[in-house]
């Protein structure tokens, strides 16, 4: 379960975002989350939902700590380049922004060029839209 206001993803009793690299490795060995590698390095992946919206969750590490988490909406109407358009991505960006406003229970602290940000004690919660990649995502960035 994703709890955006607390900066948490709970699997059972465990908050995986408070987990160490070793604990994430252990969860990957148990098959709870996936450990993946790309050109940049190792990251973890899982699928979870919040208020009926399904997300692909990418957990990026830096210096053995969680650096950021990206939430990609799995039910996006844009499944590939042939589905993508400026209007579709702006609609998705607005949908994700409104979704977070409802989840957080308040207006964002900052709204500038394709980025909407809420500030919390644990860090930042953002919705951003990258027009060159036709991608709108939610990010958690930890302090």
Where are these regions (language model features)?
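Short helix/turn-capping signatures at newly exposed starts of structured segments
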Residues: 1-116, 122-125, 130-143
């Amino acid at each position: 379960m994703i709890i955006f206001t607390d900066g948490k993803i709970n699997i059972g009793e465990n908050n995986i975002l408070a987990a160490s690299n070793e604990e994430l490795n252990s969860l990957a060995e148990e098959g709870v989350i996936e450990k993946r590698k790309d050109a940049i390095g190792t990251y973890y992946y899982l699928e979870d939902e919040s208020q009926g919206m399904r997300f692909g969750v990418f957990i990026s590490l830096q210096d053995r700590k969680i650096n950021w988490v990206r939430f990609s909406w799995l039910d996006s109407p844009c499944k590939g380049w042939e589905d993508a358009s400026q209007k579709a991505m702006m609609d998705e960006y607005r949908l994700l922004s409104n979704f977070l406003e409802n989840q957080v229970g308040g207006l964002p602290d900052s709204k500038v060029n394709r980025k909407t940000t809420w500030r919390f004690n644990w860090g930042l919660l953002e919705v951003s839209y990258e027009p060159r990649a036709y991608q709108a995502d939610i990010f958690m960035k930890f302090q």
